[in-house]
Amino acid sequence: ISRYGLFPFASSLDTCGVLTRSVKDAAIVVDAMKGIDKYDQTSWDSSDIHLYEAIDGKVDGKKLFYIKEITDISNYPDASKELKRHLEIFYETIDKLRKVGVEVEEVSIDKTLLQAIPSVYVCLSCAEATSNMSNLTGIIFGPRGKGDNVMDMMKDHRTKGFSPLIKRRFVIGSYVLQKENQERYFVNAQRVRRLIVNKMKELFKTYDALILPVSTGVAP
């Protein structure tokens, strides 16, 4: 799905998707939206892929996997009732899938690699967001800030225009992109991401899909 027209955050991570109430609805919407777009160089020709037509209801023999370290309640010593219930529902879903012929297997992944994911995400996403949004100065884009000179106008615009959370991300992004920090943080985060990607590619040689709870709780 083309990203043209959307506001970029982290270019190497941003993807488009749809939220629907069923797999069929998702297939219909994505079939209508997918395809190559000359305005998005990351898009590709998917005209030979027809998701809705591929839905035949036959799941027998499909192989799914879930990650033990994420779904094992013993890994959450202070688990809330909500989290416990979410995981109960997850395992109930696994049982239902197995009853209709889907093979679902538990896979263990190195905890060190899994624990690195949040840090890698923060490092890469904040760095890319800082770069992507550096043009929002109030001079060319956005409302004009107040001030007697260009620097004061940009400071006023960016101070008022971004939330505290976004500002914190800019601070992190600017820090990891500094020349003296790039190798230690940004480049190493890219290397760890490659390890994560390679691990997932290896698993998808055996399995058709990954199944996991969407989150450990509702949004705050």
Where are the regions that the model predicts?
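Generic secondary-structure signature for well-ordered alpha-helical cores
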Residues: V18-K24, I28-Y39, D95, K99-E103, ...
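Acyltransferase
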Residues: L51, E82-D110, F141-K146, M153-H157, ...
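Short helix-loop capping/hinge segments that flank enzyme active sites or metal/cofactor-binding pockets
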Residues: K58-I67, T71-Y76, C123, A127-V197, ...
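Short connector loops at secondary-structure junctions
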Residues: V100-Y121, I172
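Predominant activation on well-ordered alpha-helical scaffold segments within soluble catalytic domains
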Residues: K24-D31, Y91, T130, S134, ...
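A short helix-breaking turn/cap at a secondary-structure junction
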Residues: I1-E88, D152-D156
